Amino acid sequence: MYKLVLIRHGESVWNQENRFTGWQDVDLSEKGRAEALKGGKALREKGFSFDVAYTSVLKRAIKTLNFVLDEVDQVWLPVHKDWRLNERHYGALQGLNKAETAARHGEEQVKIWRRSYDTPPPPMEVSDPRHPSHDPRYKNVDAQLLPSNESLKDTVARFLPLWDGTIAPAVKSGKNVLIVAHGNSLRALMQHLEGMTPDEIMGVNMPTGIPMMYELDANLKVLKKEFIGDPDEVKAAIEAVANQGKAK
């Protein structure tokens, strides 16, 4: 039996402002830092330790991982940062307030952009200085692979080669693996592990900063899944994520 722990980064400044964030490299909010520390403490109290960690190249995930590793007293742990664990690219929506966008375009359209499986939001122009092709952290990535927008289906296609080629073999080798990433890159993994349909994954909301543990069999099929935290707090956090795309 293998164990795999997933954590969505703590609340970011743009989560706090209810903005579409995507690949924009915004920092953790004060609440987000507290969430990361609390998540790490919960793991420590349950006796978790890890052999390797994976995260994205965005600071809100990297800093969350650092806080968690500090809490479990494993700041020395090997950490692999990979752009394929980035959040889904929200295209031209990045930076826009979700509630204002819902009021303008309708809640149903925003829900489709946020939660449908294969409908991407409007693309970001390549000439936009925020486009990843202008960001030095992606200078060694094939420009054809850098998105201007993504659906969840696109995010799955981007992430799965990293899972199949690197992370899954680490899990199968018996390593205790920690992944700290983003709502949609983690949903991509959840869909893959649990065999969810597009409709099923559309209804899944990942709370910020709360560790989720999978127990997996020899074929990486899910035996057990549970959040490491107070059940009422987990429920409230999931509902808060679900309500982000609604007009005020």
From Swiss-Prot:
Enzyme class at the top of the EC tree: isomerase
Residues marked Transition state stabilizer (site): H182
Positions bound to substrate: 8-15, 21-22, 60, 87-90, 98, 114-115, 183-184
Presence of the UniProt keyword Ribonucleoprotein in the record: no
Region Disordered, residue ranges: 116-135
Gene Ontology BP terms: gluconeogenesis; glycolytic process
Catalytic activity: (2R)-2-phosphoglycerate = (2R)-3-phosphoglycerate
Stretch forming the signal peptide: none
Pathway named in the protein's UniProt entry: Carbohydrate degradation; glycolysis; pyruvate from D-glyceraldehyde 3-phosphate: step 3/5
UniProt superkingdom: Bacteria
UniProt EC number: 5.4.2.11
UniProt key word Isomerase: yes
InterPro entries given in the database record: His_Pase_superF_clade-1 (IPR013078), His_PPase_superfam (IPR029033), PG/BPGM_mutase_AS (IPR001345), Phosphogly_mut1 (IPR005952)
Active site: H9, E87
GO MF term (any one): phosphoglycerate mutase activity
Keywords for the protein's UniProt record, in alphabetical order: Gluconeogenesis, Glycolysis, Isomerase
PANTHER family xrefs: PHOSPHOGLYCERATE MUTASE
Quaternary data: Homodimer.
NCBIfam families to which the protein is assigned, alphabetical: pgm_1, PRK14115.1
Database matches in HAMAP family: PGAM_GpmA
Protein family: Belongs to the phosphoglycerate mutase family. BPG-dependent PGAM subfamily.
Function: Catalyzes the interconversion of 2-phosphoglycerate and 3-phosphoglycerate.
The protein's name: 2,3-bisphosphoglycerate-dependent phosphoglycerate mutase
Provenance organism: Bdellovibrio bacteriovorus (strain ATCC 15356 / DSM 50701 / NCIMB 9529 / HD100)
